[in-house]
Amino acid sequence: MNQTRVFLIFAWLMVAALLWMEWGKEKAAANAPVAAATQSVPAARDLDAATPSAANVPAAQAIPQAGAPGKVPATSTTTATPAAAGTAPVVTLTSDVLRLKLDGRSVLDAELLQFPQTKDGTAPVSLLTEDAAHPYNATSGWASEHSPVPGVGGFRAEQPGTTFELAKGQNTLVVPFVWNGPNGVSIRRTFTLERGRYAISIKDEVINKSAAPWNGYVFRKLSRVPTILSRGMTNPDSFSFNGATWYSPQAGYERRAFKDYMDDGGLNRQITGGWIALLQHHFFTAWIPQNDQASLYVLNKDGPRDVAELRGPAFTVAPGQTATTEARLWVGPKLVSLIAKEDVKGLDRVIDYSRFSIMAIIGQGLFWVLSHLHSFLHNWGWAIVGLVVLLRLVLYPLSSAQYKSSAKMRKFQPRLAQLKERYGDDRVKYQQATMELFKKEKINPMGGCLPLLIQMPIFFALYWVLVESVELRQAPWLGWIQDLTARDPHFILPALNIAIMWATQKLTPTPGIDPMQAKMMQFMPLVFGAMMAFVPSGLVLYWVVNGGLNLLIQWWMIRQHGEKPSKIIRANAK
């Protein structure tokens, strides 16, 4: 198989993939009205706090001041006190990066104040929402078989007022809530927001001043009716993974897409530490328990809602004792630097460069280089250009081998033409004679393909880096490129890509190519140009700069071998 055929196969595979995406877009659009008509979505505050119903919730391993670990029933038959019923006032907590609306039990709405929805707009991204069609909430509640627990509306803010804001010069906002149950049992819940941080600390203290032991367990869940995304080249949101992910020290990173959420059955697994999250393009939510905390990880459906949940720990609080449990709730962007500060093992995988570890590692390495270049150049577009230059330097030995292979192919092109003339339409004999010539002259027909094949994983990894990196969201390069994660609005870069591919094609020998392949090759620049018109402009920038440097190096290498580029162009034009 020669280099041209390899290139054609790769090109048509990419075209087929894009056609499949467009077909998926039409299919999703056709199914959307039916799905919307058949779903009835309850509001988050109408959902019962006692929804967990799994058995064998892990007992607490080490809870300060707590009595013996409790036993959670096989089915949750939670008793909520009459005093807990009703609707608690919605309280607003505001930091420099988050605005949360919550009732002490559920975070009903979360706005990301530093991330506008559109480039020129002022309305912030709303990650958690009470939208009637597609609600998305984070909830933390308590369940028990016999002991009283807070129900919907059970928690009340300790301080008067419904609005709490991080003041100027203040680094921490602490807002406590409390539920007062019967017979002296209470739960004090404290929300802590920090300046510049998207992880919300939530601490629960179960205080038992009654004369009897209290038994129960905490559950923390994310529930969402996912938005139906059209799968097409013009919708970059659909390129990114949308669904649930979780991480355990034992099994590592796993994920489940919304579109086939329960196809493999629900998740029901005991894990110590780890985290569970719901991902979308550029943003995510996650529950992060304590490292030594054992929880039951659960994926299930609650009507139209997809639910990702942690259950546990379960424990018994003796009379006169207090038990404490803590967790973090992340509501925010996939910012590498801030995720790293949380120091949670595996949490960096929410930046989903690939489900395959090796591709994810390549993506992380590329972003590391890209971010360091940005720290010097202060522009993500120029950082991409710098990354291309570095990659060309690193891959130069392979590129040199590719050009040498091309030079050999050009040298033997007249002899290949003679073989073509000798055997005419007998393709089998022609191919046999060609391979014998290559073997005799020690020519590797795949030598020019190897550098291309090695660069493909880098190209695909970089594609996901540019799609996934929220750091590049709405980041400008220069002039008409004001968002590197959006397509080129004027198609200038795709047009440059077509011109560069056409020029490169003219400088590349195509010995032994049949007329059909030659015609297909002539259309390749247009095919790739059409594809590049709908992908992120940052990726097209990479491809244009890479192709331009490749063209210059190829021109220079041809001259180094004593050949004239104009002669090669005329030969390929025949």
UniProtKB/Swiss-Prot annotation:
Q: Name one GO cellular component term.
A: plasma membrane
Q: Does the keyword Transmembrane apply?
A: yes
Q: Name one Pfam family in it.
A: YidC_periplas
A Gene Ontology biological process in which this protein takes part is: protein insertion into membrane
Localized where? Cell inner membrane
Top-level taxon of origin: Bacteria
Q: Which InterPro entries match?
A: Membr_insert_YidC (IPR019998), Membr_insert_YidC_N (IPR028053), YidC/ALB3/OXA1/COX18 (IPR001708), YidC/Oxa/ALB_C (IPR028055), YidC_ALB_C (IPR047196), YidC_periplasmic_sf (IPR038221)
User: What membrane topology does this protein have?
Assistant: Multi-pass membrane protein
Q: Where are the transmembrane segments?
A: 6-26, 350-370, 376-396, 447-467, 491-511, 525-545
Give the GO molecular function terms: membrane insertase activity
Keywords of the record, alphabetical order, are: Cell inner membrane, Cell membrane, Chaperone, Membrane, Protein transport, Transmembrane, Transmembrane helix, Transport
What's the main place this protein lives? membrane
Does the keyword Transit peptide belong to this entry?
Answer: no
| Annotated NCBIfam families | PRK01318.1-3, yidC_nterm, yidC_oxa1_cterm
Q: Which HAMAP family match?
A: YidC_type1
User: What's the subunit arrangement here?
Assistant: Interacts with the Sec translocase complex via SecD. Specifically interacts with transmembrane segments of nascent integral membrane proteins during membrane integration.
User: Which family is it part of?
Assistant: Belongs to the OXA1/ALB3/YidC family. Type 1 subfamily.
Function of this protein?
A: Required for the insertion and/or proper folding and/or complex formation of integral membrane proteins into the membrane. Involved in integration of membrane proteins that insert both dependently and independently of the Sec translocase complex, as well as at least some lipoproteins. Aids folding of multispanning membrane proteins.
Name this protein carries in UniProt: Membrane protein insertase YidC
Per the UniProt record, the source organism is Xanthomonas oryzae pv. oryzae (strain KACC10331 / KXO85)
Lineage summary: Bacteria, Pseudomonadati, Pseudomonadota, Gammaproteobacteria, Lysobacterales
Report the gene name: yidC
